[in-house]
Amino acid sequence: GVDVLLGQGLLAPRTPFTGEGPSQKSYGTELLSKPNDGK
């Protein structure tokens, strides 16, 4: 899923949902678990 893409650095530069660094794999999990969190 998204973790794999992040691991490859494809979605790393753009993590607007979490606002975390490129090493954060929470891009997908955060988005699914709490999409309205605003992080």
Swiss-Prot record:
- Tell me how temperature affects activity: Optimum temperature is 45 degrees Celsius.
Recount how this protein's activity depends on pH. Optimum pH is 5.5.
- What keywords is this UniProt entry annotated with? Carbohydrate metabolism, Cellulose degradation, Glycosidase, Hydrolase, Polysaccharide degradation
At the top of the EC hierarchy, this enzyme's class is hydrolase
| Segments for region (Disordered) | 1-39
Protein's GO biological process: cellulose catabolic process
Citing just one GO molecular function, the answer is:
beta-glucosidase activity
Give the organism the record lists.
Passalora fulva (Tomato leaf mold)
Catalytic activity reads: Hydrolysis of terminal, non-reducing beta-D-glucosyl residues with release of beta-D-glucose
The catalytic activity of this protein is classed by the Enzyme Commission as 3.2.1.21
**Name of the protein described by the UniProt record:** Beta-glucosidase 2
Q: What parts of the sequence cross the membrane?
A: none
